[in-house]
Amino acid sequence: MMERREFLGHMARATVAGGAVLAVGRRAWPLAETPAGNARRASVVDFGADPTGQKDATAAVQRAIATLGKRNARLVFPAGKYSFAASDAVLMDFRGYEGLEIFGNGAELSFAGATQPLRLTDCKDLEIHDITVEWTRPPFSQGIIRAAGARGVTVAVDAAYPVDGTERVQALLGFESHGKGPLASGVTVYNVGAVQLKGSQVLEIALAERASFKVGDSIVLLHPASDTAALRLEGCEQILLETVSFHTAPGAAVVLSGCGDITLNTVRVIPHPGSGRLISSCGDGVEILDCTGTASVQHALIQGSAGAGMRVQQAYWRVSQVADPQSALLASTDGKPVPEWLLPPQGTYMQISEAATLKLLGEIAVSKAEAVPGGMRLSFSETLSPAIGKGTLFCLSATNQLQLKMDDCKFRGGPYIGLVAQSRARIGNSSFSGYAGPAILLAPDLEHMRGPVVENVHITDCSFSDCNLARRTLTPGEERGAITIDTKPEPQVEQEAAAIPNRINEGITLQRNVFSQLGAPAIYCAGASWLDVESNRFGDCDRLRPAGAEPRAIVLRNLDESTITGNEASAAAKVVMIDCTDKVKVGDNGPLTNATS
């Protein structure tokens, strides 16, 4: 049975440790082999691009790019609409540029099929301004469920999404009516069987697993045959994306892999206004993976991504062999050599963790890194401890990891999670609403080799509403909060009580946040020390609790050295402590009461 994690892992696999799936083995446009010119500026209309969108602009845009020099060049799209024919190639491919600027002047770039619109590799000091990315035919369809059974559904597909029964359906995402519009129900199926046309715009879809879709609910059918990102940056530095919008993409809207010093200003991943679409990108909204320096994210608007709204993570690398006392071979998740932009530079510190528990074993500086078949070889000036062997995990140390600074951002819902992050994150003055799962998830993910453990995270002055409304009942040990801090990304679903999580997370501050209308507790934290929850406000939490049960505002499992104080609630609710030490101090929290188990 394919689960959500497996499907989303497939959609994002190219961007984690092995990063080069889309960069390797794909037919490229002739531009990739064309030497750069020496022009400082090129307007695509001067090379024949049609700003009315009536003609294919591919050749004209590539002619314009071919004239540009590698330093301080500017590519200009005059205002208008530019259409691009379907292809399995990278349409605009830049490598080794410095000072590149791409100005859109509000232009809409409309793509088709599996085309990858824009890829930049090993570029420095680059800017992209004022462009909107769209697909002529979205890589999904949506409609209304007319019949539903345990092993199949009949869907009346909206006329805006023409279907003939030959479309491949990779996943089904359920939505139910809620107030002003549909919200993700949390009913999602990734194991889809045969599809048959049963009349004009009516599809009968077999399911390989049981699902609880309801007649009358809205549903989205994901079709993408690839995990193509609309914008992909690999190994780039000093990046500015400003007023760039993405209405859909077959995979993530934006992927930044192995990049440094990123500024995202007014980036939007949203359904096309007025389209009535329930989702935007078919993968994550924005992925910031294995990056360094600072990522400053301001005024972003994220809505409707099928995966996480934003994902900020580092890769775990598993030792496949200790070659000698001062070198180790590390395996990539895709079995390929690690691309150059992901090799840690000389002097980079790596943290070393025990695979079974994620317990930190120490840190070591890299003296040399080189790609080898199946991964990379790291060499060190120091001698490795005998405790380090096959299976041990390496990850960038905290001093080398990216620092996320997020301010004034809006996450407006989707069928999964708003923000996934791990460490060195400051999230302020932002709002999260309408997610089937948590608004913010902080947890390492060994299944997909993403980390590190949670450390040095501050979430302040944010609002959370209408989250964790998925149709499911969680037993003790499986809770998720609007903010969830855990030792694993998914709850442990077992017949017996969940195992006590290892205490590996630390240094989390949650202050002056407002929580309301939540299906689950506002905060769930497991396996942590030094959690500070102060001056938050809670209202109408835990709405999906069992009948007769008292609502839970906060659930804490196996915590130490933590403080929960000065919080307020509009109604009685509980602070639940499970397997916590006596160094967890809870008090002065208005009508919130303490419960220990």
Please give the residue ranges for each predicted region.
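N-terminal secretory signal peptides and thylakoid transit peptides that target proteins
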Residues: 1-18
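Right-handed parallel beta-helix/beta-solenoid
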Residues: 29-60
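N-terminal extracellular ligand-recognition/capping segment immediately after the signal peptide
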Residues: 45-49, 58-66, 70-100, 104-119, ...
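The right-handed parallel beta-helix/beta-solenoid scaffold, focusing on the short coil/turn
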Residues: 73, 80, 90, 98-100, ...
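Short glycine/acidic-rich loop motifs that flank beta-strands on beta-rich extracellular proteins
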Residues: 86-89, 111-117, 137-141, 228-230, ...
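Ser/Thr/Gly-rich low-complexity blocks that favor extended beta-strand/coil architectures
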Residues: 111, 135-137, 142, 158-198, ...
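Small/polar beta-strand repeat architecture
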Residues: 181-228, 360-363, 368-404, 408, ...
